[in-house]
Amino acid sequence: MEEGGRDKAPLQPQQPPATSPGSGDEKPSGKERRDAGDKDKEQELSEEDKQLQDELEMLVERLGEKDTSLYRPALEELRRQIRSSTTSMTSVPKPLKFLRPHYGKLKEIYENMAPGENKRFAADIISVLAMTMSGERECLKYRLVGSQEELASWGHEYVRHLAGEVAKEWQELDDAEKTQREPLLTLVKEIVPYNMAHNAEHEACDLLMEIEQVDMLEKDIDENAYAKVCLYLTSCVNYVPEPENSALLRCALGVFRKFSRFPEALRLALMLNDMELVEDIFTSCKDVVVQKQMAFMLGRHGVFLELSEDVEEYEDLTEIMSNVQLNSNFLALARELDIMEPKVPDDIYKTHLENNRFGGSGSQVDSARMNLASSFVNGFVNAAFGQDKLLTDDGNKWLYKNKDHGMLSAAASLGMILLWDVDGGLTQIDKYLYSSEDYIKSGALLACGIVNSGVRNECDPALALLSDYVLHNSNTMRLGSIFGLGLAYAGSNREDVLTLLLPVMGDSKSSMEVAGVTALACGMIAVGSCNGDVTSTILQTIMEKSETELKDTYARWLPLGLGLNHLGKGEAIEAILAALEVVSEPFRSFANTLVDVCAYAGSGNVLKVQQLLHICSEHFDSKEKEEDKDKKEKKDKDKKEAPADMGAHQGVAVLGIALIAMGEEIGAEMALRTFGHLLRYGEPTLRRAVPLALALISVSNPRLNILDTLSKFSHDADPEVSYNSIFAMGMVGSGTNNARLAAMLRQLAQYHAKDPNNLFMVRLAQGLTHLGKGTLTLCPYHSDRQLMSQVAVAGLLTVLVSFLDVRNIILGKSHYVLYGLVAAMQPRMLVTFDEELRPLPVSVRVGQAVDVVGQAGKPKTITGFQTHTTPVLLAHGERAELATEEFLPVTPILEGFVILRKNPNYDL
């Protein structure tokens, strides 16, 4: 019997008929029309349909008669008819179609029935019928007064319809009306398990999100569905406002813990940025192998937990979290890929490819400037490889080819080459600490900090070496040591380091630059922790400075330090914004905007982006009016204003849009379009910031449309736009060895051969493109682009905010700020270990990641894959999965360091 109700004639003769004329319709006005229609319809109906229609009409009439003993069998028959027809998915089931015109009559009959079982039974049937009528949630109304028999018997479509009505009804009830919500809740408790059991997990989640009862999920979830449910919940996070987004994450986290999926739970705890929870998850896991995997994840995210000594395998876990092995694992990858051979800058510039051989004439324009560029390029390209051809053999020769501040950056680049190699690196840097030149000494101090970036060491070598120079008489020495400490302890929130640095800001000998760098360093160390001491000290420093001092370009680093301290903290910044109200313009709006955008970094908060767009547009009108008055006067005024005005807050607003939107794909796409408009119509300060924003939204992800835009603006009439565009090209392609970008940059190098500043930028971009010979990334997102590393964002922001005044900072004397990028450098590799942490080469498939949220079954998660043997490199947007069933990964996301276990069910 369970058939029929297909598009054409149903198989069983009895099926629900269209109405006969005169079947008490609610609206008599439409009745005549319908009668005519029915006449036509009756002609078309097949025998079986006709029979079905008559039968249903008879049943309805029977319900209208006085004889109550006939009600029960009539209702039974109606129900059987409706149920037996719900098998078809493509069309409205015939019985429902034929009963529609009787809907009003059935309701009347229901009202006149005596209370009791029959009345409830009738309510059930009307409830199902209501699904086809667009009424005022009558499906729900009659369901609640019906016989409460199980939902499943009426089919999936009915359950879906009901769920929609429950959600709407819930939103109309106030919190006060608790009693009315009770029956709805009981319904929900039926709907959710039904959906879970029928592959409609996301519908269950949607319903619970609508009625804000997500916590109910945990009870109804089973082994098969939890992965899908959690994937759906976490992918909804970007689209719901505070505080619901954290509620969703906490719910998914609870589900993972229920099934002892610790690595997944840990990842969500890191997304929530809740350190107590992280520690709780880590310590509650009793499986040492899983703990090691979680330690790798924490190390990658830059989180260090103080474990008690009695934890099993304490030393191993501490070592993994401290990233002690990062350098040796990275070098193992380099040997595997056969790229250990050091490169010199000329290998990158490929000067031999330039046709008119003006490598000579170009480099004579500003030889110190070119040598400085080569120092950076050499550092970027050989980063973390531990050897190069300029500095590690006989560095002095190279250092003295640089002048003054150039020596500082050149010496510091040694730190980049020895990145993460604390034991071996410091001995090589040591000899420069005794140099007679302050600049070289300061650079060596910075190098010590860089080497320790992202790596913990119980001996704290960076603190020991650098602490003596923090209040040194020479401001040059202060710069190197303070910025070095900032990089070495970024994200650690170490009180001892902060107490050492904070007094420097108020010290009378500190120049504005030193005060700025100190604020920066403190912001990096306390990143995202809302550290009270850091906040109060920086605020106090800002208050104490005079208006002219705040016009100094280095003053921009003070609010940046504040912003980094509150990175991603959302509303926690209200008090600071209030405190900044007393500062004079233009510094106030600059600081306010900067702190504000940092607080929402990576959140994808649409409302914030709208506010920032207002900031970008508001300024424009007022200037336009002036322009009409007197263009000439405006030009002169602009020239005078430019250095004093801090590139105002508009530049920051543009960067902020990128900073907020980079967290999720759709927001980033929309931001891209906006940037296009800003580049065409914006003020000069705005246009200078747009290339930097493009760089931030697509770090280490060389998308052609972005590269083309940047390439176009690298020839802009405004030199600062072109400097920033060229550098942005380097950021977008950082660590990718992208051939198309490399070719673009070589052409630019020829085009700008006579312009030392632009050429300097081209060289930097070339160095970044080949960062770590193509093995490193600057992208702050990891774990399938779910987690944002705050330390990495801090490093990127430091550099980009400094580029807002590229002429005075980067092309001036403070190019050492570029080493902020070190905080974001991470190997983009996948290395697999066995349970004893020995390298274990296995074959993996690497391909473009596919979004599988809310899809049924087990869809493929990657497309267009190639099979490699680990260790392998993963490009932006790629995902890996094991190509063998012999091993099972301990964590579902294959990225960074992954521990594999033997599959017990694997038979050889």
Swiss-Prot record:
An annotated GO BP: regulation of protein catabolic process
MF terms (GO), sorted A to Z: enzyme regulator activity
Modified residues (N-acetylmethionine): 1
One Pfam family from the record: PC_rep
Residues recorded with modification Phosphoserine: 29, 147, 361, 363
Residue span of region Disordered: 1-52, 623-645
Sequence ranges of the PC repeats: 409-442, 443-479, 480-514, 517-551, 560-589, 692-723, 742-757
Gene3D superfamilies xref list: Leucine-rich Repeat Variant
Basic and acidic residues bias spans: 24-52, 623-643
Entry keyword annotation includes Transcription regulation: no
Chain positions covered by the region annotation Required for interaction with UBLCP1: 708-903
PANTHER family: 26S PROTEASOME NON-ATPASE REGULATORY SUBUNIT (PTHR10943), 26S PROTEASOME NON-ATPASE REGULATORY SUBUNIT 2 (PTHR10943:SF1)
Entry function: Component of the 26S proteasome, a multiprotein complex involved in the ATP-dependent degradation of ubiquitinated proteins. This complex plays a key role in the maintenance of protein homeostasis by removing misfolded or damaged proteins, which could impair cellular functions, and by removing proteins whose functions are no longer required. Therefore, the proteasome participates in numerous cellular processes, including cell cycle progression, apoptosis, or DNA damage repair. Binds to the intracellular domain of tumor necrosis factor type 1 receptor. The binding domain of TRAP1 and TRAP2 resides outside the death domain of TNFR1.
Record's subunit section: Component of the 19S proteasome regulatory particle complex. The 26S proteasome consists of a 20S core particle (CP) and two 19S regulatory subunits (RP). The regulatory particle is made of a lid composed of 9 subunits, a base containing 6 ATPases and few additional components including PSMD2. Interacts with RPGRIP1L. Interacts with CRY1 in a KDM8-dependent manner.
Protein name listed in UniProt: 26S proteasome non-ATPase regulatory subunit 2
Gene source species: Bos taurus (Bovine)
Gene that this sequence comes from: PSMD2
